[in-house]
Amino acid sequence: MTEFRDALGNITQINDKLERIVSLSPSVTETLFEYGLGKKIVGVSAFCKRPAETDNIRKVGSYGTARIEVLDEIKPDIVMMMSGYAEPLYKKIRERYNTFLFKLPTTVFGILELIKEVGIVTSSQDKARELEYAMLQGLKKVRKYSMKGYLEIDLGGPVTFGSQSYITDSLTLFGLTLPFEMRQHEWMVPNDQEIVEFDPDILIYEGKMYRGSNKEEVQKAFTDRGYGNSSFMRNKNIFVTPGKLDFFAHHGPSFFREVIPWLRNTLDSVSL
């Protein structure tokens, strides 16, 4: 049994060998599988979709809710969660179960720190070091581009990001200038007029999870919102993230394997 201090400063005692893990964070779940701990996971959130094997694991809740009766049934050794939106739920679950809260990353290197911390908490330090090295190799794909960009995600409505988000950090690492990169927020509802005045060269759009989107839908939606004369519309620099799962909105190991290469290839294709 080892003591760990979590994102809120609470001390949690965790078995050195975990047998029954519940993860309510998609990023933590993906990382646990990377460490060969998939068979130890007895419960996940409805949004834990990476890897595909998660489909066969009992669904315990979502980002901000959990079925306590299911937790009572499966009796986890540990419940793993992410700080931020889920903190009220964390406090509720912690009253009944051993619970550990990881810090929501605010930078690309914060994602690496999360991956490493999951390894430390689960006594998988050796595998964590190997994965950390592999993820660092992905950052070799980063190069600088000189252009103005805007990224928006449908999270039940349009959402964009400020300086406290790893998403903003990833885009500015590639040299993009963003309309809200200096705002002291993690996320915000976008102000269309401000963005029109900023006049981005490119638009990166991520559709709602499980639904996705396509370029034609996005072009129509942004035309209706008053972006018809924006540079990204005139030059047809509208890029929709692939698939129907969270892409930029997911901060697990696949961020380095999928998002970083996609972003570089996308920026390489931009014609201004």
Q: Where in the sequence are the language-model features?
A:
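Proline-aspartate-enriched helix->loop->beta-strand connector
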Residues: 65-84, 98, 191-209
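Extracytoplasmic substrate-binding proteins
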Residues: 1-4, 10-14, 20, 78, ...
